[in-house]
Regions:
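Low-complexity, intrinsically disordered terminal/linker segments enriched in charged
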Residues: 152-167
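Sec-dependent N-terminal signal peptides
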Residues: 4-13
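Short, low-complexity N-terminal intrinsically disordered segments enriched in polar/charged residues
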Residues: 17-57, 61
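A mature extracytoplasmic/lumenal domain signature
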Residues: 63, 73-74, 124-126, 141, ...
Length: 167
């Protein structure tokens, strides 16, 4: 009986040390937690689908009006990003989303200086086609999200094939 009482007390003590956040148990010394499915991961999927459908209205609705895009060594505003995508579309380049591989969200318990608390990381695989020429481009994407909108997007990918398609 003493062992059962000791087990119950130990269990209660350990449970009371955890911080609950959005239904997830988070240790008291954690700075945040990671989940594999959320409204924010759905938002990233929504933007990816809008991109391949050339639906700029839906695409823009996923971002704050002052969103910044950091692609490899360049940066752009939302307006500049959409203009670049439109230029590709005007050249006849068609985007196809092959898959979004791994995708997860990291949520920080204390907002960063900019107010960001959520970061969605994803690996996105697209085929870009122009005429009879196709290339596969794999994007490593980090989206900074605040209040259900993406405020920054960091992309890393090999853009050499895209330059060839644009010629």
């Amino acid at each position: 009986m003493k062992k059962i009482a000791l087990l119950v007390i130990t269990t209660i003590s350990l449970m009371s040390c955890d911080t609950k956040s959005n239904g997830h148990n988070v240790p008291s010394n954690a700075t945040g937690y990671t989940i594999d499915s959320s409204a924010n991961t759905d938002l990233v999927r929504k933007a990816a689908n809008a991109l391949v459908n050339n639906d700029t209205t839906t695409y823009k609705s996923c971002y704050t009006s002052d969103a910044k895009f950091y692609e490899n060594n360049d940066s752009a505003t939302l307006t500049q990003n959409i203009a670049g995508l439109q230029a590709m579309h005007d050249k006849g380049i068609v985007w196809k989303l092959n898959k979004i591989g791994a995708i997860w969200e990291t949520i920080y318990l204390t907002p960063k200086a900019s107010g960001k608390t959520s970061y969605v990381i994803s690996y996105q695989n697209y085929t870009l086609t122009r005429g009879g020429k196709s290339i596969v481009v794999r994007f490593n994407v980090l989206n900074n999200i605040k209040d259900g909108k993406m405020m920054a997007e960091h992309l890393r990918y090999d853009n050499s094939g895209i330059a060839e398609l644009m010629k």
